[in-house]
Amino acid sequence: MRLFGVVNASPDSLHTESIVRTPEEAMDRARLLLANGADAIDLGAQGSTDIAEVVEWTVEWNRMEALVPQLARLGVDVSVDTWRPEVAARALAAGATVLNAADGMQQEAMWVVAAEHGVPVVVPFLSGADPRSMTMVEGDPVEAIVGFFEARLATAARFGIRERCILDPGTGFAPPNWPWEQRYHYQKEVYSRLDELRVFGLPLYIALPWRRTDQHDELLELVVRQQPEFGRVHHPERVREIERRLGIGIG
């Protein structure tokens, strides 16, 4: 599994270790992630949880503007994690090499940006217009995810970039006030059925659990066993440890 290590330029991330405020802090964080087993960097500057302040796209971009070219000098892929096409376009022009589209590619403008820059696109499932407006998924979650991807990939084909799409079942996002026990069972159901998402013939990308509880550890190992192509991770060393224990090749 290729791992994208998380660097957060948003000050209200739940994972405080990932927060950076200067290019120097961003480089230190990125180098640590790469040393611990990450292959690439995922950079975001707008929190997606309900506790994060929603800022204007100009503020989001200002937070990461100086970071993108610095991280690009590391010689690894850098993904820009955003739901704003204005931010995506600027980050890709500044050296980012992957679009991690936190709007689920539901905006036409995001497809325009992706097509213009010719980059791989992570397409996450969302039950809302963006991560801040999620609703509960009714019925079979995998059926809902498949239906969502069918619609997004039809648009991708229209823009001629279907083959560059990477599919994310969206388990890193959640509606506000979702009880953990319910979310745990939802994620376990989705992770147990990742093979059903391979019907599209495209790589899979999972936002990997980072909290240290028995249930989070169980979910992390479940994902690693499914061997998706990509993972978004705060602690790459945990993933590599599980891979070694299970005898799963790294890379």
Language model features by range: what are they?
Residues G5, S13-D28, D50-A66, P85, ...:
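Active-site-adjacent loop and "lid" segments of alpha/beta metabolic enzymes
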Residues D28-G44, F230:
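Catalytic domains of carbohydrate-active enzymes, especially glycoside hydrolases
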Residues A40, V98, E163-R164, F230:
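Residues at the N-termini of beta-strands
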Residues V78-V80:
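Conserved hydrophobic beta-strand within the GNAT/NAT acetyltransferase core sheet
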Residues M1-L3:
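Extreme N-terminal starter segment of soluble prokaryotic enzymes
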Residues L34-A35, R73, L92-A93, M110-V121, ...:
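Acidic (Asp/Glu)-rich catalytic clusters
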Residues L71-V76, R158-I161, V199-G201, I250:
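Short helix-capping segments at alpha-helix termini
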